[in-house]
């Protein structure tokens, strides 16, 4: 039913990647093909290459951005990966095709509970404050943040392993948003700007009690 839409999505993703002198690997493309995006968003065109609205005023990211962020993390099957901002659950589902050790945090209980019903049970979920990461389960080899921060949260950097990477949208001095790749080495970190983006803001705190892991 969705085969043509999926093929078109993949072609568009590959086209966008060339504009950024990048290439989306076959393993990421396969993860996109195996993850039914239409289960994560209510839309007549769930595979269109654009962000779409979901519940609670949030969005599901543009497929190219999902693919690009996943690609830039260079995830190995042995890696422990933390996602900040579960949202629809689509990005976490993609990550679960790259490694069996995926953790994801959502601050909005309505979204967190809904995605817990959709996601594979081996994905560890939590309804809590993403700014604080998941200290009890850290450290993590990779962290992906799906909301824009004023600056990279120190708690997340602290929870990266030596040699670990984090991809995160960050506000720049002009008030715009940059997608940034952070690499940690010997308790120091540096960042590389990848592209301009637009995400919902990363909000401190959470709406309700801390539900812990599920």
List where the protein language model places each region:
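Class I SAM-dependent transferase core
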Residues: 1-82, 90-94, 98, 111-119, ...
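Conserved nucleotide-cofactor-binding alpha/beta core module
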Residues: 74-190
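Glycine-rich phosphate/pyrophosphate-binding loop
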Residues: 214
């Amino acid at each position: 039913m969705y085969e043509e839409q999926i093929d078109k999505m993949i072609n568009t993703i590959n086209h966008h990647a060339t504009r950024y002198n990048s290439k989306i690997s076959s393993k990421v493309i396969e993860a996109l093909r195996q993850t039914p995006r239409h289960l994560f968003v209510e839309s007549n065109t769930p595979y269109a290459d654009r962000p779409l609205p979901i519940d609670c005023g949030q969005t599901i990211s543009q497929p190219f951005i999902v693919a690009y962020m996943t690609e830039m993390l260079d995830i190995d099957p042995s890696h422990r990966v933390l996602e900040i901002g579960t949202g629809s659950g689509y990005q976490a589902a993609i990550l679960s095709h790259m490694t069996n050790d995926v953790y994801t945090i959502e601050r909005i209980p309505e979204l967190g509970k809904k995605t817990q019903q959709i996601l594979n049970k081996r994905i560890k979920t939590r309804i809590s404050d993403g700014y604080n990461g998941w200290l009890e389960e850290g450290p993590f080899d990779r962290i992906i943040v799906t909301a824009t921060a004023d600056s990279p949260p120190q708690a997340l950097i602290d929870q990266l392993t030596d040699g670990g990477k984090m991809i995160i949208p960050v506000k720049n001095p002009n008030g715009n948003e940059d997608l940034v790749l952070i690499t940690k080495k010997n308790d120091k970190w540096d960042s590389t700007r990848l592209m301009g983006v637009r995400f919902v803001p990363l909000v401190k705190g959470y709406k309700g009690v801390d539900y812990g892991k599920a």
